[in-house]
Amino acid sequence: MPTSRRALAGGALSMHVAYFLAISCLGYGLLGVLKVREPGAAPRRIDRFFTAVSAATVSSMSTVEMEVFSNGQLVVLTVLMLLGGEVFVSLVGLASKWSKLRSDAMDRSRRVESHGDVALADIDGGDVENPTSSGEEAASRRRPMDADTLRHNAVRALFYIVLAIFAVVHVVGAVAVAAYVLASPGARRTLGDKSLNTWTFAVFTTVSTFSNCGFMPTNENMVVFKRDAPLQLLLVPQVLAGNTLFAPLLAACVWAAAAATRREELVEMAREGGRAAAAGYAHLMPARRCWMLAATVAAFVAVLMALVCGMEWGGALQGMSPWEKVVNALFLAVNARHTGESTVDLSILAPAILVLFVLMMYLPPYTTWFPFEENSTTKDSNAENQGIRLLESTLLSQLSYLTIFVIAICITERRKLKEDPLNFSVLSIVVEVVSAYGNVGFSMGYSCSRQINPDHLCTDKWTGFVGRWSDSGKLILIFVMFFGRLKKFSMKGGKAWKLS
């Protein structure tokens, strides 16, 4: 059994790797075929591939300015973000599981029919001495069928619920963003100055926000909308619904559907430990875990908001009204986990805030303060899993991998670390690497004014810090983005290493 489970886990990892590589390569090809806005500003090949990987892994790390891309290329990036988002990927997994369960049910049905033909032949032969015994045998054959049918129906119902959430958030979100832009002269003027279509902006922004990518079709990300508090408040629920609070939202929808229909599979999923009925869908959690998760998210956001307001009220937030400052602090706090849309230049934030951002970017979305003993349906402690846990424990921890990545970047960029220490600081590299690992997209950027030996040919660009790295450094960060997108397969590593 452990061998088969390890093979299953390895197969899932291989499928995920193949999926993200395929859509990244497809995006790279399409971005190369389609024309950019200005022919002379076409990105280099490695920058095109970097952008495609960044969109597919919903990382929003950037090496080129977003306004370089034409409307057609923005559509390609929108599709990549849609396909790479966690909710969509889990939806594909549910569809695959539903198809497999339906196929298994059809196979069982054919076997039962063949057994029924044999039993009918036995009855015709006169073997009717113990009808009670044969009835019990038939009932025992039906009981597993009932459990399998319940599981099949649960997966099917869950697929439709997740699909409904996915569709409603995108439709309502895009319409709401477009309505705000059309109603706001300032926002409409901003898009007009950048030659951006309102609906392209609305759809792109909604997909990017719900998938927790963080790309915006503007060079400055959300900095140009830092005075548009209503727009930020429209995006905050989309950020939460697509990431840290997706599990509580899903649980609430399952509970509402169960209360409205009283269908057996929905009632089973709504119960504590209903993940078993839903074939272990990772985003379906018991009610108590959902409540604690929501409380943890609220606490993290409150701490981040308090620190940003306390340290940047007269700094990075200067020039805004008190209401706008509070909303901007909320927007930054929510986006630190893990969307990466920003309304301020992160390089001017206090180091204490940046360190806390690094911690928030490192933590998984469902990090929860949960001081309760897990029950048997939640805790994975079966004897058959010992082999899997032994294999996982021999791997390095996530912090060890991040340390290796930071060291590798420091080696590839060692010359710039010496010549341009204010821009190429270790903190800037750590922020960039952890942001790529967490698929966030926060970056401290690069400023020509911080150069110790000014280069008169240097021009400031609205790109991430990685845009100034060597090709070797960019390739390492591409690997980090893939690794971060697939980190759920290695989260339990490093347990064999004892520090005391």
UniProtKB/Swiss-Prot annotation:
Recorded topology in the membrane: Multi-pass membrane protein
Comment, domains: HKT transporters are proposed to contain 4 pore-forming regions enclosed by transmembrane segments with each containing a potassium channel-like selectivity filter motif.
Family, as annotated: Belongs to the TrkH potassium transport family. HKT (TC 2.A.38.3) subfamily.
Record region (Disordered): 121-145
Job description of the protein: Probable cation transporter. May be involved in regulation of potassium-sodium homeostasis.
Side of membrane Cytoplasmic, spans: 1-12, 95-156, 260-290, 367-390, 485-500
Gene Ontology cellular-component terms listed: plasma membrane
Family matches, as PANTHER family: CATION TRANSPORTER HKT1_4-RELATED, POTASSIUM TRANSPORT PROTEIN DDB_G0292412-RELATED
Gene Ontology biological process terms from the UniProt entry: inorganic cation transmembrane transport; metal ion transport
Residues annotated as transmembrane: 13-33, 74-94, 157-177, 239-259, 291-311, 346-366, 391-411, 464-484
Gene symbol of the encoding locus: HKT1;4
Protein name: Probable cation transporter HKT1;4
Keywords from the named record: Ion transport, Membrane, Transmembrane, Transmembrane helix, Transport
Intracellular or extracellular location(s): Membrane
Source species: Oryza sativa subsp. japonica (Rice)
Main location: membrane
